[in-house]
Amino acid sequence: MNLSEISYRRVVVKLGTSVLTSGSLKLDKAHMVELARQMACLMKAGVEVVLCTSGAIAAGKEHLGYPQLPDTIASKQLLAAVGQSQLILAWSQLFSIYGLHVGQLLLTRADLHDRERYLNARDSLNALLNNGIIPIINENDAVATAEIKVGDNDNLSARAALLCDADLLILLTDQKGLFDADPRKNPDAKLITEVQNIDDSLRMLAGGAVSGLGTGGMATKLEAADIARRAGVEVVIASGHHKDVIQNVVCAKPVGTHFTALEHPLESRKQWILAGPKARGQVVLDTGAITAVTQKGRSLLSKGIIEVNGLFQRGDTIELVDTKGKVYAKGMSRYGSLDVSKIAGKHSDNIEEILGYDYGDAVVHRNDMVVL
């Protein structure tokens, strides 16, 4: 690889189940060899690589001889527990061919929700990278429940990119990228090569495109791309079976769909608000409050709140939505849901009179808010 061609220095590569199995029921070891070779070439060229890998459940099924198990969470956790060790062993053996070591990081949303644990995860990730070790990240499916799951490795890889301050996230799938129609149904569908803004029309376009295996489809990849690009990370969605795809993307060659990063990315704490804590509830805003928050950079005041959904505590992350449920922002509430219900629609000057105390005029301060 020509060093002068390299456009990025720290890269997160996400491999979906459909890429690792090539559409079969077991890991495609031959293809994993090729992917490991590409990543090893990057490492040798001075590019730091983080691997976010799916495939634990598929590996577990294969190792146990495809057992007949009930379709329950416990069965999936069993398969993940068995398969994760097989998956990390396979990657360790493959990278050892090139004299490279790997380190395993298993995460849940709980590790990202708490600010201290989030920073600890970041320190661990950076320690591996700084010592020339390839971090291999997966969700800890053996213990994760619906409440603490990130949900898919697309979103997990975006959060990993934020954790390690990567400048590129590569999402490899069984599709060539994002198309203007479903290529499996429409032979005239055209590949979208460049995306500078993710809007509702693009989200609708991606909504129906789902990979054959795994938990992620094109919609989750779009969510991941949106998180990453807001933090200043460029994103490429491409086919994991395209020849030399990883190297070509890192050398900025035209492959897949490229999402440009925001020119002015979010600062670190707001990155955490966006990607770390799960929203515990919602507040419904009137049109004036939506305009103030999204267009004028204002804090959310109690006067602009129409309704409160869900139960949340002071300091929890909540979503700011309109009457139709569209999410406009995400932020940390300075008041619990019961208090917000009491002061909703009331002037900020009356908060102390209503509650007997106050934590400031803003329900969500602009410094604790990310506009989406």
Swiss-Prot record:
Binding residues for substrate: S54, D141, N153
Catalytic activity: L-glutamate + ATP = L-glutamyl 5-phosphate + ADP
GO biological process, one term: L-proline biosynthetic process
Domain PUA: 280-358
UniProt-annotated location(s): Cytoplasm
Sorted UniProt keywords: Amino-acid biosynthesis, ATP-binding, Cytoplasm, Kinase, Nucleotide-binding, Proline biosynthesis, Transferase
Pathway: Amino-acid biosynthesis; L-proline biosynthesis; L-glutamate 5-semialdehyde from L-glutamate: step 1/2
GO molecular function, one term: RNA binding
Enzyme Commission number: 2.7.2.11
GO cellular component, one term: cytosol
Entries under InterPro entries matching the protein: AceGlu_kinase-like_sf (IPR036393), Asp/Glu/Uridylate_kinase (IPR001048), G5K_ProB (IPR041739), Glu/AcGlu_kinase (IPR001057), Glu_5kinase (IPR011529), Glu_5kinase/COase_Synthase (IPR005715), Glutamate_5-kinase_CS (IPR019797), PUA (IPR002478)
Main localization (coarse): cytoplasm
Binding-site residues, ATP: K14, T173, D174, T215, G216, G217, M218, A219, T220, K221
Source organism, top-level taxon: Bacteria
Pfam families linked to this entry: AA_kinase, PUA
Function in brief: Catalyzes the transfer of a phosphate group to glutamate to form L-glutamate 5-phosphate.
Family matches, as NCBIfam families: proB
Family under the similarity heading: Belongs to the glutamate 5-kinase family.
Protein name per UniProt: Glutamate 5-kinase
Lineage: Bacteria, Pseudomonadati, Pseudomonadota, Gammaproteobacteria, Alteromonadales
Gene (UniProt): proB
